[in-house]
Amino acid sequence: MSNTPYNSSVPSIASMTQSSVSRSPNMHTATTPGANTSSNSPPLHMSSDSSKIKRKRNRIPLSCTICRKRKVKCDKLRPHCQQCTKTGVAHLCHYMEQTWAEEAEKELLKDNELKKLRERVKSLEKTLSKVHSSPSSNSLKSYNTPESSNLFMGSDEHTTLVNANTGSASSASHMHQQQQQQQQQEQQQDFSRSANANANSSSLSISNKYDNDELDLTKDFDLLHIKSNGTIHLGATHWLSIMKGDPYLKLLWGHIFAMREKLNEWYYQKNSYSKLKSSKCPINHAQAPPSAAAAATRKCPVDHSAFSSGMVAPKEETPLPRKCPVDHTMFSSGMIPPREDTSSQKRCPVDHTMYSAGMMPPKDETPSPFSTKAMIDHNKHTMNPPQSKCPVDHRNYMKDYPSDMANSSSNPASRCPIDHSSMKNTAALPASTHNTIPHHQPQSGSHARSHPAQNRKHDSYMTESEVLATLCEMLPPKRVIALFIEKFFKHLYPAIPILDEQNFKNHVNQMLSLSSMNPTVNNFGMSMPSSSTLENQPITQINLPKLSDSCNLGILIIILRLTWLSIPSNSCEVDLGEESGSFLVPNESSNMSASALTSMAKEESLLLKHETPVEALELCQKYLIKFDELSSISNNNVNLTTVQFAIFYNFYMKSASNDLTTLTNTNNTGMANPGHDSESHQILLSNITQMAFSCGLHRDPDNFPQLNATIPATSQDVSNNGSKKANPSTNPTLNNNMSAATTNSSSRSGSADSRSGSNPVNKKENQVSIERFKHTWRKIWYYIVSMDVNQSLSLGSPRLLRNLRDFSDTKLPSASRIDYVRDIKELIIVKNFTLFFQIDLCIIAVLNHILNVSLARSVRKFELDSLINLLKNLTYGTENVNDVVSSLINKGLLPTSEGGSVDSNNDEIYGLPKLPDILNHGQHNQNLYADGRNTSSSDIDKKLDLPHESTTRALFFSKHMTIRMLLYLLNYILFTHYEPMGSEDPGTNILAKEYAQEALNFAMDGYRNCMIFFNNIRNTNSLFDYMNVILSYPCLDIGHRSLQFIVCLILRAKCGPLTGMRESSIITNGTSSGFNSSVEDEDVKVKQESSDEMKKDDFMKDVNLDSGDSLAEILMSRMLLFQKLTKQLSKKYNYAIRMNKSTGFFVSLLDTPSKKSDSKSGGSSFMLGNWKHPKVSNMSGFLAGDKDQLQKCPVYQDALGFVSPTGANEGSAPMQGMSLQGSTARMGGTQLPPIRSYKPITYTSSNLRRMNETGEAEAKRRRFNDGYIDNNSNNDIPRGISPKPSNGLSSVQPLLSSFSMNQLNGGTIPTVPSLTNITSQMGALPSLDRITTNQINLPDPSRDEAFDNSIKQMTPMTSAFMNANTTIPSSTLNGNMNMNGAGTANTDTSVNGSALSTLTSPQGSDLASNSATQYKPDLEDFLMQNSNFNGLMINPSSLVEVVGGYNDPNNLGRNDAVDFLPVDNVEIDGLVDFYRADFPIWE
């Protein structure tokens, strides 16, 4: 290999400099041609030659790294040589920078910077002139006038002339006038053509018309999740933001939430009637509100003496457990009971008299006398020392008690009735111990966790030696650890490349003595075991001489755990049936030999046998690293190794979310997955960022010369036969803060010997070690920057590291002077850092316009269009990433302070490959997409085996998914902005449809990529080998986001036009509760035909919005396939459970109802207790929270938060809108903008035809008590049948169209609301109990003497609802009213400060002729009245399961249902203490 210093490709300045250096100082000796200067040199120069040898010039190779690695001749061409081009690795062609060429490089950088600044000035002036050219952004005439065009073009030409600095003022003015005249003619022609063109040909001009439209994203897509312990803000990029941004979803959720409340009221009436018939007290004692009389006496307001003698006592209905929470089987033969007064007997430590008759006294800490929490006398309980386990059976205790008690963290007694502080925990828990909630964990701090303690000691007081001994038992054998580490650096390291591989392996050798297994040592100092006899050699000792070694041990445990989880055999097996073949990608198994495949299979089978338990990480981070203290209150021991462990810990929690419940005590926030949406990750990332600032990572290490003065002992010396293993403390590591304080005397003496020049080889190695330390420094910093961008994108939260270049000058890892010839994979890592940072800059440009309040409040359409076009150029490969970043800067979309200036000398060859090329790597004749291109074949003379190539391509795949998800989000934002404007401005219809089609294309692209990933994770040697854990959640999250848009389009396709709020009725055409037989038969036939077509559907093709009637069926087939996928993934990943529930929720809700199939099983098929949906099980657990819990859900708040305040004009037309009395008054009069009526982009003539046919169908007669009742009859209406409104509207009224009180036959039908709803009106959120609709009829109280007598004994507040004698006129339907004890109406009064719905007495209706014994609520009739949503007939049976059942008091405190919406199961602390109180005991 020739390395001549004289190369024509080197710049002339550099060549001259090098030649002058090589010819001096002996230039005079070369005067005689052909003379041998070395042999004729006088002896005087011998000393000079010897001095040259001592200096040992650090010669930089001129050949590229790849050619030197392959040991072939390099032609040294820039930017890449011919050898690399032929081999197909031109993107990896890398030249080491020459030290003597730095000055010339700086001059070139200055020229490039000036050139870019000129281009940016031109672009900014052009953009500014465009903005000022159109003062009216919504007027096509003002924009297309010749004057505005002249201003635009004239300003543009003027800037060009000024920048060129050529020509005189007169010539410039002449040219300017000519250009104005030319532009006037062109603009007039364009204006005349646009006036006569059709909609398709004028799309460009229409787009220009709305370019300056402003969008306010701060209100349309921001959510606030009110939790039990605080609030969480969710920005526009969060997956829940679509729930607020889409009007159809908002109305649908409002319908579902209101329907759920009405269903609860129906169950309440049914239960009240059952109690009335069985002579039980009608008051729910567990949920009864306080009153003035009852609060003082703590007695039930109902006179029980008025009931018959056979009445069952109300205490039997109490939901509180009467079972002793103590596991009596815990009392061993030698145990001394804890109670002081029963020391000679084996008695239960709990006083059972406290549980007699269901009486649960309040705990000491609660000042309220009406608390439901139990009290145990902790002062009388002392634990015997031999007892090692709490005698309380935590399973029964935590399951039976209310959730607010179980989740209380202020007092340990609220979690367990035993005082654990008096226990002495010295013995170990048995292996068969059930999963208990440990009580030794601290309850403060972001990382105080509660998790099961399995197969390990009760670690309340474990010493360091005990922890190390336990870890030795948990860790795998030495040979297995070595294999795990090799697998990690081969497959997983590119995903988190913040370690120095060589240095980390050496530290593992020092801690675990792995080098003692085999004398053979590889190049990185890691022993490579080869003998099977040493396979089971266990870890007997762990050496941790320094604090940083504890962090390295923690990183090792994470690597062992994460690598084991990522083994392809551990991935979830997915079988999509016939569609599986559509999502397969070619693997590389065919390129491997049979012996290599066999060896790989043996290694994986060996690794599968040795799982590192997650408890090992808990012990290490709690007792050795003490990470809770480091991340919260102390930074004394923070160094680079600590930051690395924190990053690995964060990475592990996000990837291995199934272990999150073991490592964290994060409460169930109801999010899609607590491991990914939890705020604990935000806190941890902020701690990592602050620790990085503390270590100085935001400054480049070249700024600190003291790093060069502190020269560490080289890792190569340590690796040579382990000579320094006996005294590891004398070997400072690269991962420590390299300061004089951390370097002991022995290392400093060794460094002094090296600096003295006695060992030049060691000095050179030390310089390499310092450079590698700086390299690790830079990698850690830019990985933190990437983490910040990803978290902001996932949660919609502001970035922590904004305007990076204002406070950081850290260079990219590509600036490190490292020779990668021995470590090619590190070269790939370096290039990935540069590429991924440039992609992050593109993402930052989008996040700035969506999340930054200053920009998002008035972002313009043309800015979002520019972002869309640049991102499309990037993901489609039509523009290099460098050009995309430059365009963002030039257009003012990305400030240079974000880091754009760093990319001045980036490699233009190494870019983001096209997605088809990534998926079809090595397969030139196979395409997954219809528009995919075959990669051109190149002449490859010698294949270079690149390390972790498949992992790098998998990371490229994830970057494509992220970019295309942003494209979907931007198009969706513009679509939802312009779609409602179509009724007022028809020109926006074209824009809305274009954006909708683009959003659908990118949503389907994310859906396909999600399917491709999960369909190939188990394939051997596939693209996603060992990436199943790391990329599972990102891929599934993007697929879930895509399905949300599918739901939006299905609603539009099935519902038709949205007639809006406060303008007209939701249903424009009257519909009936029944179905026309001909229409139903046609629908069934069409559904069967569409299902047959779905079998032939190609899931890899895009979906066209013009598909017509089949659009809903096509999209529904995608949802069914995704539901099938998430159901299979739920066995492996916890976050897939919620996504499966979410998908099943909409599948069941939007499925086309079939009246015939429902009628076969009779009317009882709608009963919640006797029916389950065949497709989705346990659907009623979706919204398991009660009404107050739902009020804290951000989806609920935004679904019902846009209502208008009640006005006088709305009182005369209660059916035309919805209103919540008093809600806006409490909220200070603020409200979200109303939803306007408009036709969706999917609306066709077929929708109108079906709505008319359905509307003309006559209402079917329904069977009631073996007889038919005519709904149109004006006679007495039997029980259970809601009367038809007198205003001519159909009896089937959608719930949203009748939130205000409906007039029914001249009066209103009252409903006894749940008594718990009375006291929940003081919150700032609107409550559902004021939302009224067609109610189920009540029995006549006058026919039941017991009922009438009980009403007389009620408090005035309760009597207002149960014994009102005055019929309220229609003019006061929307007013605030209350009833006194006499039954008279008092206007302008309220209960607890909030208005209630107007109610009338049942005696005033036609129901008085029937007795209470004839009353039988009909659930089917009730559901059919509310199953119509904007023309979409929702399956009533599905509605029951979707909205959930009545919250039975006997089931209070259960927390087994998992909501896919963020619904908390406990109250928010401090918010309800002043107005919430219950009656747990009735005397």
Swiss-Prot record:
Q: Where are the HRM repeats?
A: 280-285, 299-304, 323-328, 347-352, 389-394, 415-420, 1192-1197
Stretch list, region Disordered:
1-56, 126-208, 432-458, 706-767
Residue stretches of biased makeup (Low complexity): 130-142, 177-208, 735-759
One GO cellular-component annotation of the UniProt record comes to: nucleus
Matching SUPFAM superfamilies: Leucine zipper domain (SSF57959), Zn2/Cys6 DNA-binding domain (SSF57701)
Summarize where Zn(2+) 2 binds, as residue positions. 64, 81, 84, 93
Which GO annotations describe the biological process of this protein? DNA-templated transcription
Query: Which residue numbers delimit the DNA-binding region?
Result: 64-93
Location of region: Heme-responsive: 244-444
Gene3D superfamilies in the cross-refs = 1.20.5.170, Zn(2)-C6 fungal-type DNA-binding domain
Molecular function GO terms recorded: DNA-binding transcription activator activity, RNA polymerase II-specific; RNA polymerase II cis-regulatory region sequence-specific DNA binding; zinc ion binding
Is Transcription regulation found in the keyword set? Answer: yes
Q: Name one Pfam family in it.
A: Zn_clus
Q: Any other noteworthy remark?
A: Heme is an effector molecule for CYP1/HAP1. The repeat region (see FT table) mediates heme induction by masking the DNA-binding domain in the absence of inducer.
What this chain does, per the record?
Answer: Regulation of oxygen dependent gene expression. It modulates the expression of Iso-1 (CYP1) and Iso-2 (CYP3) cytochrome c. In response to heme, promotes transcription of genes encoding functions required for respiration, controlling oxidative damage and repression of anaerobic genes. Binds to the sequence 5'-CGGNNNTNNCGG-3'.
Binding partners and assembly: Binds DNA as a homodimer. Interacts with SRO9 and YDJ1. In the absence of heme, binds to at least four cellular proteins, including YDJ1 and SRO9, forming a high-molecular-weight complex (HMC) which results in repression of its activity and dictates its DNA-binding specificity.
Listed name of the protein: Heme-responsive zinc finger transcription factor HAP1
